[in-house]
Amino acid sequence: MIINGKELALSLKQEMAANVATFTEKYGRVPHLVVILVGEDPGSVSYVTGKAKASEEVGIKNTTIRREATITEEELLGIIDELNADDTVDGILVQLPLPKHIDSDKVIAAISAEKDVDGFHPMNVANLWLKQPCTLPCTPKGIIKLLKRADVEIAGKDVVVVGRSNIVGLPVSKLLLNENATVTIAHSRTKDLKEVTRRADILVVAIGRPKFVTADMVKPGAVVIDVGVNRDPETKKLCGDVDFAAIEPIASAITPVPGGVGPMTITCLMENTIECFLRKMEK
C-alpha cells in the first residue's frame, strides 16, 4: 500500500478551512502566520511559496517578510521582537537554513514560545519531552497522523528511526514512544545498521541521503516512512532516503517522495498556527 500524504493533507485542510470559518465568526479575525525568508535559496523560496498557498487554502492570513542574505543578526532579531509584540500575529516562522553569519539557535529562541509554529523553541522542545502541552514540530506530527490515518498500529511495535536530528529524528522518536512503541534510534555510528533496520515493524528514515535504504535492509511486511527529500544523482528527479521502487513490493505500506510526508508537514504547520491562535483567543 502506498500511503498518500497528498490526499490526507487535502482532507485535513478541508476540515481546517471549515474550522477557521467558524473561529473567524466567533473571534472576528482569521489566524495570522508571518514567515521570514532571508536570502534567495531556491529550496527555501519554494517552501515559503508552498506555505503561502496552504494558508490561502485553509483561510489563514499569511505575510511573508523577505530580507537580503546580508541582513545582520541584530536586524533579524529586531524584526522578531516586533512580531512577538504584535497582537495581530499568531504564528512566526523563520525559514531555515539561515546565512552562516546568523546563529539559527539564537533566532529560534528569540521567537515567543506561544508563536513558535515550528515547535523548535527550547520551551516547546522541553515540554515535548516532559509530555506537557506544547506546539509539536510539524514533520514528526505529520508522520504520526499519516500512520494513524493508514490504520497502522503503533503500540507494541518495534520502530527504528534512522536519523537523530532535532527537527525530525529525536522528536518523532519521542512521539512514537508516547504511542507506546519500542523505539530504536539509529545513526551514522550505528554498528550493523542493516541488522538493526531489519528488526523494524515500522521504519522511519530521515538522513538526507538519496536511496540510502535498500530492499535488503527492510523486513518484509514492514511499514516504511521516508522523510528524505533529495535529488537522484542519476536522473536528477526528486527522491527519498529509501529505494522506493525496490522496497514498495516488500513493504506492507510506504510513503512516496514526493507526495508522502512533505504535504503533511505543511498541513501540520497550518494546524499549529490555528492552535496558537486559539490558545491566545481562549485565554
Where are these regions (language model features)?
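Glycine-rich phosphate/diphosphate-binding loop of Rossmann-like nucleotide-binding domains
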Residues: 38-52, 134-223, 227, 232, ...
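Positively charged, low-complexity intrinsically disordered leader regions
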Residues: 1-28
